[in-house]
Amino acid sequence: MKKERKQTPYIELSKVNKFFGITKALEQIDFQIFSGEVIGLVGPNGAGKSTMMKILTGVLPPTDGKIIVDGTEMKRYTTKEAKEAGIACAYQDLSLCTNLSVYENFAMLNVEHGMFTKPGWRKTAKKETKELLEKYFPNNQIDIMKPVERLTLAERQIVEICKTLMTDNLRVLILDEPTSALSTDKANQLHKVVEELSARGTSVIYISHKLEEILKISDRIVMMRNGKNSGECDPKEIDTVQLVEMLGGSGAAKGKQKINRENAAKGDMAVSVKNYTGKGLYNINLHVHKGEIVGISGLAG
C-alpha cells in the first residue's frame, strides 16, 4: 500500500555532483526520501549508487550541491552528522572485524570502552548478541563465539545487517545488496524486518540487482545510470520485464544488430536459439559455436 508522504522529505540531495579528478561519478543528482518510505535503488554497476550512499553516510563529501536533513540544509556533513541524523548502512563489502568473534563485533558498538569496563560485560554482550540475531533472523544457527572469518558469507551478511540495526536513533537504513548470499527463507525474514521498520517510520534504501525483490518490497523505485537520475516508477504499476526495459535492457531484445561471427566461430554451431520468448524471457537470440567462450551478463531478473 502506498504510504502518505509528509510535505518535507527527511533526507534530500539537491543538484549533487561528485568528481574524482576529471571523472564525473555523480551529475546533478536529486534524491528525496520520506519517513517510513522504502526506496528501491537500481541501476547497472558503475551507475553511481554506491557513491551516492557514501555521500548520504558522510563518508564522501559532494563536490557541490545541497544535503538537506529534516528541512535544514547542512553546511557541514560528515559521518558524525550522518550518525546524528540516524543514517546507517549495511555494506555489501561488509564492515565487520573478521579477527573478532561475532559477539565481540556487537560489543564494539554497545559496550562502554575504557580502562575500567564494567564486570560481566562479556556475558551481557553474548546474551544481547544472541537475542538480536534471533529477533531479526530466527533459527539462524550462528555461533556467536566464532571469529567472523570462519562464518559463511550468508552468516556474515546476517551479522552485518543486525549490527547496523543496533543503531539507537535509526531513521534511515541503507541496505546494499543485502540478500546476495541469503537463502530465500532468510531473505523473506529480512523483508519482514524492512516492513516492520517502515511501519515504525524508519526509511529504507534498498539496493539490489534482484528486480523481483525490488518490485516486491519497494514503495518507490529510483533508477540510476551513468551517475545520473534516469527516472523513477511505482512498483505496483510495472512488472520485471517493464523494469528491465526502463533500465535500458530492452535494446538487446528489440535491436536487430548484426554480429560478425567470423572470428568467433571456431567450429560448427553447437547451440542456436532464435527469437525465443518464454517465462521471463523475450525475443532471445543466442548462437554458440564449438570452442567459443560466450560471456553473459545483465541485471538479476
Where do the language-model regions lie?
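Glycine-rich phosphate-binding loops of nucleotide-dependent enzymes
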Residues: 2-301
